[in-house]
Design a protein with these regions (language model features):
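A hydrophobic membrane-anchoring alpha-helix module
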Residues: 108-135
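Mature, soluble, non-transmembrane domains
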Residues: 37-76, 98-100
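Long, glycine/tryptophan/cysteine-rich extracytoplasmic
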Residues: 1-18, 64-109
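Hydrophobic alpha-helical transmembrane segments
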Residues: 17-37, 46-57, 116-122
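Membrane-helix exit/interface motif
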Residues: 7-13, 32-39
Length: 138
């Protein structure tokens, strides 16, 4: 927020709804995953995996929409106005994943430890589904 107003970005509040929704959703999915683990039904493992994929995709899409909105809906009254070669207002959207040069800055966006743990947990759940399916056939 300190520098964003110079290029016309909106103020980013600390109380966006996602900061309340995401922790609850993650907590529910953890509890649901533990319950499914104790039940040991391989079909439920797959259902949990698919639900996590859907929720993860929805979360990334929501984050992309926030980035797009804040990076493209700029105030025309900003102290600094930057234009693209075609005369349109230059956007300042950071990357969802990867690196991107924005003027003389390079913005980076890569997963951290929590994302790696989430990925490992999802892969273990998928592996448990295949093991459970194989055991049921035998």
């Amino acid at each position: 927020n300190l520098m964003n107003h110079y290029v016309g970005m909106q103020y980013i509040p600390d109380t966006i709804p996602e900061f309340k929704i995401f922790p609850v959703a993650i907590g529910i999915m953890v509890v649901l995953g533990v319950i499914i683990g104790f039940l040991g039904n391989h079909k439920l493992f797959l259902a949990w995996f698919v639900l996590m994929c859907i929720l993860g995709t929805a979360g990334m899409y929501d984050f992309y929409l926030w980035e797009y909105d804040y990076g493209h809906n700029l105030s025309p009254k900003a102290i600094m106005n930057f234009k693209n070669p075609d005369g349109s207002v230059m956007g300042f959207q950071p990357p969802l994943f990867g690196s991107k040069v924005i003027l003389n800055f390079t913005a980076h966006s890569y997963p951290r430890t929590g994302a790696y743990f989430l990925f490992v947990g999802m892969m273990l759940t998928l592996a448990a589904f295949f093991v459970g399916r194989k055991e049921k056939k035998a």
